[in-house]
Amino acid sequence: MENERRTDQKTGMGLEETRLSDILSASQIKATDTYETPPQIIWIDNSTIATLGNFSASTGKAKSKKTFNVSALVAASLAGKQVLNYRAHLPEGKRRILYVDTEQSRYHCHTVLERILRLAGLPTTADSENLDFICLREYSPTVRISVIDYALRQGKGYGLVIIDGIRDLMLDINSTSESVEVINTTMVWSSRYDMHIHC
């Protein structure tokens, strides 16, 4: 019995060693490697602010017009033209946008959606085929993360994902472990689905 336990532990450790060795090998960056520049998708004036496979954030005090700023960024991406100071171009196969709001009511989310459509020069009486806007206010952080993950796994060709209220993906904003977990999740999403996430 004791020998069986030791063998199981060694086998388990051997699998873990193999897994870590594989991760180490796959993670090495070598001078002889070549990488393509990630596609640039959003600019302010002539400065690139977003590429596929990365994420960014808008910061500011409460009620400092962050959502309006993000609305202009989304409108530029949706229209493929300049809106305010934002210029955007999502590549073929990555033209869809997922907008996730975690804090506002459905009424206020609808107001933001209308603003985006107006800024993009699109009708406010018809849904855009390239924009999915979801309101997750009434759900728990765990459910919100699961719904976003589910939406991304559907393979709808999202090039840009907006998470308005990333702090609402965690129970305790002061928990460093929870914060790290949410940031790691967004990094995995942006890399796995080759899209830009803006929070």
What spans do the regions from the language model cover?
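Interdomain "pre-motor" coupling segment immediately N-terminal to P-loop NTPase/helicase cores
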Residues: 1-14
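The Walker A/P-loop phosphate-binding site
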Residues: 12-116
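Structural recognition of the conserved hydrophobic beta-strand(s) that form the central parallel beta-sheet
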Residues: 58, 162-164, 194-199
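Conserved inter-motif catalytic segment of the P-loop NTP-binding fold
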Residues: 91-174
